[in-house]
Amino acid sequence: MQDLKIKCVADSKCMLGEGPVWDEINQDLYWVDILGNKIFRYDLSSKTVDWWETPEHVGFIVLKKGGGLIAGLRTGLHQLELQSNNKVSGRRIDRVDENTDHIRFNDGICDSRGRIWGCTMDMNQEAPLGKYYKYNGELSRTEVDKGYVVANGPALSPDGNYLYTVETVGGAALNKGIYISELKDGATVKGKQLFINWNKHSKSTFPDGIISDAEGNLWIGEFGGNVLRCFS
């Protein structure tokens, strides 16, 4: 693997910046400020940054075919349109906060089949209330995993046969670390195992966002360490 150099392209001063999404067609980079309730977009050609306020904490966004975004907000999955006044408009598609004020979407991705995989967390970071959900192309929800205090990711292997999930803080149910599960027929999760025990790697930092590259390497943002880790 060649040496990589990291540089700042947009000093957006986020409270909790996460979830980069690349728009290949328009050559734009999107990301969210979860606690700042904002969506950002960086235009590669003009090197300018635009932003939009969201009505709730925004855990992740994915690009919607035909325009607009699907976003995991605090109370659930929303369809959003970006407006010219730094605001968003839209509607809630699905509610996942279970009628509590301390559950929210924390992270999520769209896979090559157009399915959305999203996860929730306990905002108090105490109880194993976090879950992983899968939405099909019609945005019908299926619960695929549970028992996380702070869930992150997930990531899928390049062949789509394995799902990687993250327990960021750890608790009575799950150790802090990365978990791997088999995806039967690319859909049904089974056989979850601890893949990377983070406490053996670091007791003072936390595994956060995760992605798998074309070679099957796992890239993990290390919260509290200001480091991007690659596991192969």
Predicted region positions:
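A short beta-strand motif characteristic of beta-propeller blades
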Residues: K5-D11, K47-E53, R91-E98, L139-K146, ...
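Beta-rich, blade/repeat-based domains predominating
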Residues: S12-N26, P55-G72, E98-R115, K146-T165, ...
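Conserved beta-strand positions in repeat-built beta-propeller and related beta-rich domains
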Residues: E24, L29-I34, I70-T75, I116-E126, ...
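A short loop-to-beta-strand structural motif that recurs across blades of beta-propeller domains
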Residues: K38-F40, G76-H78, G130-Y133, G177-Y179, ...
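Flexible "stalk/tail and boundary" regions
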Residues: L44, L82-N85, Y133-L139, V227-S232
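Short loop/turn segments immediately following beta-strands, especially the blade-tip
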Residues: L80-N86, I180-T188
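Hydrophobic alpha-helical segments and helix pairs
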Residues: K87-V144
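Glycine/small-residue-rich hydrophobic helix-like segments
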Residues: G186-S232
